[in-house]
Amino acid sequence: MAEGHGDANGATAHTAADGGHKAPFPPFQKDTFASQLVSLLIAFVALYLIVSKIALPRVGSVLDERAKRIEDDFAAAQRLKGESDDALKAYETELAQARARAQAIGAETRERLNAASEAERKSLEEKLAVKLAEAEKTIAATRETAMSNVRGIAADAAAAIVQQLSGLVPDGKALDRAVDATLKGSQA
């Protein structure tokens, strides 16, 4: 061990231990191991008690609270997912019903328009048939009138031709028969 020597001022000088070596680092001194181990054991027991009685319950309660919050959030998410699935099913059902209604309305409108256009077409066909019959009657009457005028014109022309060529006035009855025969042949 080191010995101290006092000087005139009362200061103590430290000298090297026997053998001229310095004193070893105190934790590594063999004669203090037992007290150091007891101090270390007391420190670890105190640390263990503090950690196990104060810190670990707080950490455990925080972890339990966090796990409970996660469980609650997961349950809420599952509930909301179920609600959204139900809402989606209801939406899809409503959408399918709306499509069916739209198709039914479209089909009904199409049928109604087809029926209206068919009725209009039939009405127009009937009106056209009536107008066609009237036109045919008018044409027949006009033709009859024209043919009666043609007969007179043809008889006058034939009489003029016969008189011009032969210089004789033709007999009216013979001329009428010849014109009638010629007109009947052209109509056939």
UniProtKB/Swiss-Prot annotation:
Main location, first listed in the record: membrane
GO cellular component: plasma membrane; proton-transporting ATP synthase complex
Membrane-topology annotation of the record: Single-pass membrane protein
Cellular compartment(s): Cell inner membrane
Listed Low complexity bias regions: 8-18
Disordered: annotated segments: 1-23
Transmembrane segments: 37-57
Name of one Pfam family that matches: ATP-synt_B
Top-level taxon of origin: Bacteria
This protein's UniProt keywords: ATP synthesis, Cell inner membrane, Cell membrane, CF(0), Hydrogen ion transport, Ion transport, Membrane, Transmembrane, Transmembrane helix, Transport
CDD domains cross-referenced by the UniProt entry: ATP-synt_Fo_b
Molecular function as annotated in GO: proton-transporting ATP synthase activity, rotational mechanism; proton-transporting ATPase activity, rotational mechanism
UniProt-listed InterPro entries: ATP_synth_b/b'su_bac/chlpt, ATP_synthase_B_chain
Record family assignment: Belongs to the ATPase B chain family.
Complex and partners: F-type ATPases have 2 components, F(1) - the catalytic core - and F(0) - the membrane proton channel. F(1) has five subunits: alpha(3), beta(3), gamma(1), delta(1), epsilon(1). F(0) has three main subunits: a(1), b(2) and c(10-14). The alpha and beta chains form an alternating ring which encloses part of the gamma chain. F(1) is attached to F(0) by a central stalk formed by the gamma and epsilon chains, while a peripheral stalk is formed by the delta and b chains.
Protein role: F(1)F(0) ATP synthase produces ATP from ADP in the presence of a proton or sodium gradient. F-type ATPases consist of two structural domains, F(1) containing the extramembraneous catalytic core and F(0) containing the membrane proton channel, linked together by a central stalk and a peripheral stalk. During catalysis, ATP synthesis in the catalytic domain of F(1) is coupled via a rotary mechanism of the central stalk subunits to proton translocation. Component of the F(0) channel, it forms part of the peripheral stalk, linking F(1) to F(0). The b'-subunit is a diverged and duplicated form of b found in plants and photosynthetic bacteria.
Protein known as: ATP synthase subunit b 2
Gene name of the record: atpF2
